[in-house]
Amino acid sequence: VGPMAEQVWLGTFHALAARMLRRHADLVGLSSDFTILDMDDQNRVLKQLMVADDIDPKRWPVRLLGGVIQRWKDRGLTPDKVGVAEAGDLANGRLRQLYEAYQARLLALNAVDFGDLLLHMLTVFRAHPDVLAEYHGRITHIMVDEYQDTNVAQYLWLRLLTGPHHNLCCVGDDDQSIYGWRGAEVGNICLLYTSDAADDLGR
């Protein structure tokens, strides 16, 4: 392939986001040696916070509340972006506050969960245009396979990373979407056509 191949960044969304986040961890209050928690550790942290806030884990199973928080992250929603109506009566009406406390505890532990890898990089890109511009200079062409299985956070990350080049190629089949249970939004295919960048991105 030649020496140019050494400049290619190849990996999953989360692997590439983790690579970026290690470089810019300080911008979100982490250090570069942060730990990525597995599901058991996530649930353990969340349960501790629930007990401290008098939220009964028997009435509100940890996996249920943790699943809702992860779905919010899959949609690119930080605690301040979650609407009151959307949180509803979950966790005695305090799920937004629990999400906020969970994020604060992860920062104190110098840890992230799977959803944070993209969520934190969305925060970095939006708050630090100089960092985003650096990646625009480094990454000029992007190709995504199995695009039908991307979630909203991945779509937003792509939109920001594509930047002024608009050199984005996505391969996907809406009939083959199998990860809806994990936050995948087959509607992301339609967003490529309806977004304000659609004419530049091509079809």
Where are the regions a protein language model picked out?
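Short, conserved catalytic or adaptor-binding loops enriched in Gly and charged residues
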Residues: V1-G2, L191-S195
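Single conserved hydrophobic/aromatic residue that forms the stacking wall/gate
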Residues: Y193-R203
